[in-house]
Every structure is written in structure tokens, then in C-alpha cells.
Amino acid sequence: MGRIPCCEKENVKRGQWTPEEDNKLASYIAQHGTRNWRLIPKNAGLQRCGKSCRLRWTNYLRPDLKHGQFSEAEEHIIVKFHSVLGNRWSLIAAQLPGRTDNDVKNYWNTKLKKKLSGMGIDPVTHKPFSHLMAEITTTLNPPQVSHLAEAALGCFKDEMLHLLTKKRVDLNQINFSNHNPNPNNFHEIADNEAGKIKMDGLDHGNGIMKLWDMGNGFSYGSSSSSFGNEERNDGSASPAVAAWRGHGGIRTAVAETAAAEEEERRKLKGEVVDQEEIGSEGGRGDGMTMMRNHHHHQHVFNVDNVLWDLQADDLINHMV
């Protein structure tokens, strides 16, 4: 259960005191004294709280109060007792007749504390700052100092290890993302690579695409096989053959027996055939006989031609 309020706060006046209110309070206390602060506001004709009347009388209206600046003797007393009592302002003010605890506290915080700091004195311990630093260095013996240094170094190492570990993790994540691209980009990457390969083939002067020039002739039939025009009248190779030779072509070799049989058969038919071995780079017996046929009008899909679905191994068999 709390204390009963000293007054009705609805009709209480707040704020700065006026000179008329000070006169009413001072005259009433001079006649009746300070017996009951709850009844003084009502009996003195003041719309003030009892606590407000008490503080006003104690801090401002008492006849024994001193007003004005503090003297040097008063300052010396405040500093002396503050070094012993600390911030116990009421006890310090009791050593200064006519000064209130509120006046002493305000004067210390606004004046004396700054004055002592400017003189190189700690306002809390009332000792010179240089003396405090000497005490700190002498109080901590060398083992304690080294222990503190080791602790600080350990904290620094832990922090650096954390930063390095974090950076390594970030780099691993970047590398992982580079080696594992988004699956949605696989088709785009494949298309780009295919485009590069295609453009590289087209950029060459004697590109592989020239092999399929139907004007030079490429036919494979039941009776004859021709691959463009291997040699021209001036003895130079045709563009198709040059392209195959320039790009390495198909590594071929013609068995001598098969060539002899083919030549003998064509001679019987009255055809003149010139045999030439094309692309003699090393291989393991895989090859194809490339013959020159002077019929430039023949193409892949002649009406006399027959198309076969040949296996990969059939290309190395002898042609008869």
C-alpha cells in the first residue's frame, strides 16, 4: 500500500515560482513554522504541492542560505571531502553552512570537476594522471603483462583464421559454380560450341564443305567410283582433293591386289582408268580406293546408282 498523495494533482500549479508565491510561503512559515508540509500549501493559499513548497523553502527561501559564487575556501572543502566521501552531497553540504546539497552538486559538476581535470588530476581518485599510469604499470607484474599480450595475440590469430577460412569457402563456391553451370544453360553452351566449329570450318579457304560440290562429281555406283576430278589438265589437284589433303583427309591405303583386279576388269570393258592413291597417312589397314572418272556429269544419286547401308567395317573390304 503506497503513501497517500500530499495533494490533489488536478488543481496543482506547476512550473516556475512567482515572487508573490515566494512571499506567501515565507510569511506563513515565519509565523507557523514548518510542521506539516501537506497542510502548508492550503493554509498559505498556494495551489502548489507540499513537496514543491518544501524544496522551494529549503533550497531558495531559507534565511540562512548563501547565494552567489563559492569562495576558494569552500572549493577546498568540497574537494577535500569529495576525495573521502565521494558523491554524498548532503554530508559535504553539511560542512558548508548556508550551502545546500543541490548547490554543492551543481557546482562540482559544472566547475570543480573540469578544473581538476585541467590540472592533471583525476576527479574520481583525486590523483595525478601520471601517478595513475605508473601504478598501472607497476601493479601488473611481467607474467600478467605477457599473459595479456598472448591473449591479445590469440584473439588476433583467431580473427585472421576466421577471415581466411571465409575467403577460402567463398573461392570454393565460385569454383563450384564455374564447374557446375546452370543446367538451363547446357543447350546454349552446346549451340555456341557447335557454331564455333562450323565457323572454323567455313573460315578455311579449302574448307571441308567443298567436298560436297556436286559440280565436280562424287558418285558411288555398282560399276564405278569417282571422287571429283583428282587432276586437272595442268596437273594440279582439284579443289575437293586439295581440301581433303589440306585437312588430313581420310587415312587410306589401297591394297595392290585389289587395285590390279579392278584395273584388269576395267580394261576388259574398254575403259581407261587411272589409279591414284589418296591420303597415305598411317593407319591400321582401313582405307578406300579413290578412282578418277572422266565422266563429270555423274553425281551421287544417278539413276544407275545403288545405295547401300554399309557398316563401318565394310569400307575397308576390297572392291570387286
UniProtKB/Swiss-Prot annotation:
What this chain does, per the entry, is described as: Transcription factor that binds to the DNA sequence 5'-CCAACC-3'. Regulates directly PME5, UND and GLOX1. Essential for tapetum development in anthers and microsporogenesis. Regulates the timing of tapetal programmed cell death (PCD) which is critical for pollen development. May act through the activation of UND, encoding an A1 aspartic protease. Required for anther development by regulating tapetum development, callose dissolution and exine formation. Acts upstream of A6 and FAR2/MS2, two genes required for pollen exine formation.
Main location (coarse class): nucleus
This protein's record includes keyword Repeat = yes
Additional note from the record: Plants silencing MYB80 have the majority of pollen grains distorted in shape with reduced or no cytoplasmic content, display early tapetal degeneration with large opaque bodies in the tapetal cytoplasm, and trichomes on cauline and rosette leaves contain increased nuclear DNA content and produces additional branches.
UniProt signal peptide:
none
Q: What happens when the gene is disrupted?
A: Male sterility due to distorted pollen grains lacking reticulate exine on their surface.
Which pairs of Cys residues are joined through disulfide bonds in the record? none
Q: What is this protein called?
A: Transcription factor MYB80
GO MF annotation terms: chromatin binding; DNA-binding transcription factor activity; sequence-specific DNA binding
Keyword annotations from UniProtKB, A to Z: Developmental protein, DNA-binding, Nucleus, Repeat, Transcription, Transcription regulation
Q: Which domain of life is it from?
A: Eukaryota
Location in the cell: Nucleus
A Pfam family name for this chain?
Myb_DNA-binding
Skewed-composition ranges (Basic and acidic residues): 263-272
Q: Which PROSITE patterns match?
A: HTH_MYB
Q: State which tissues express it.
A: Expressed in the tapetum and middle layer of developing anthers. Expressed in trichomes.
- Where the record puts its DNA-binding region(s)? 37-61, 89-112
Q: Region Disordered: what ranges? A: 257-283
Q: What Gene Ontology cellular component terms go with this record?
A: nucleus
Please list the residue ranges annotated as the HTH myb-type domain. 9-65, 66-116
Q: Per its UniProt record, what InterPro entries does this chain match?
A: Homeodomain-like_sf, Myb_dom, Myb_TF_plants, SANT/Myb
Q: Can you cite a GO biological process for this protein?
A: pollen development
Q: Identify the gene encoding this protein.
A: MYB80
